[in-house]
């Protein structure tokens, strides 16, 4: 039995590898905007869990005897749920809005095994630093935050601009290792079952 990661995220892969797991990588290609639109103002935690499940669903037919994991993260800032900024301009706009504020990074998890699902969401509070306009511009131009939920990464250049985290730091990187462990336990599996 293997652990299949329905993601192309190098950060999620890195977390699993650092945790002793050699995941099977099966990047999921879903229309996130269409999934969100179909939810009709669902609560933020439901939105990220539904996106995580949609990603995992793309891999279960190919891996019917394995554990399939899907994840999705979005930033809840001032009541708005924000995904990836995609452009330098949008990244700059978001950083100017979020600097000096607290926000919640929501990471939804959907784990499938043996025809059953376990879904849950982790909320971690991020305190963004009072970042200068010059640093915001330089960070956006680096390209690092363009494809990251909330327009930031905890690792790499983004580490300069996060003043504090309250909650699970691995969820901020994209996959809560403690939550994944609890999901595996619900299936009667252990984390160590997947160690290489």
Language-model regions: role of each:
Residues 18, 37-38:
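Active-site-proximal loop->helix
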Residues 1-21:
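N-terminal beta1-alpha1 ligand-phosphate binding loop
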Residues 23-24, 192:
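A local structural micro-motif
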Residues 32-37, 77-79:
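A short acidic, helix-capping loop that chelates divalent metal ions and anchors anionic groups
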Residues 8, 28, 114:
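Cofactor-binding loop segments of dinucleotide-utilizing enzymes, especially the Rossmann-like FAD-
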